[in-house]
Swiss-Prot record:
Residues 115-143 have a biased composition (Basic and acidic residues). Residues 106-158 are annotated as: Disordered. Part of the 50S ribosomal subunit. Contacts protein L20. This protein binds to 23S rRNA in the presence of protein L20. This is Large ribosomal subunit protein bL21. Belongs to the bacterial ribosomal protein bL21 family. SUPFAM superfamilies: L21p-like. GO terms for biological process: translation. Residues 146-158 have a biased composition (Low complexity). InterPro entries: bL21-like, bL21-like_sf, Ribosomal_bL21.
Amino acid sequence: MFAVIKTGGKQYRIVANQVVKVEKVIGNAGDVVEFNDVLMVGQEGSAVIGTPVVADARVTAEILEQARGRKVIAFKKRRRQNSKRTRGHRQEFTTLRVLEILMGGSKPKKAAAKPIKEEATAAKGTKDTAVEKKAEKTAEKKTASQKKAAVASKSKKD
């Protein structure tokens, strides 16, 4: 069974257990991602073509690594103007291993990662606790009137 998926503005023909390099996908090594933009699913002799995507078709894949490609140099020069500009660029990509191609609402063998929205709210929660800790520290500091009283008591003792 093969499938054609769309990710990163490109289309890839994939089969199960294939290792493929695609444009950067959010996630860490070892995470399982799911692609819902399946344009075509086929087997020997038959194929289902989506309009634009195949309904209830999904592809699950495991992230093997997040890396950057080789450097591409962009060089501009204007002759006789003493003007030149050099820029370098390294494109980020993700290496994936396709786990399985699912049709008709079947469930994946390995659970996919949680949606990004839930992770973002969890990250915001850690910021709130940090702000509360700062607020507690500032509350412990002495006020100006307390400092004057402390200085006055020291001078009376001397």
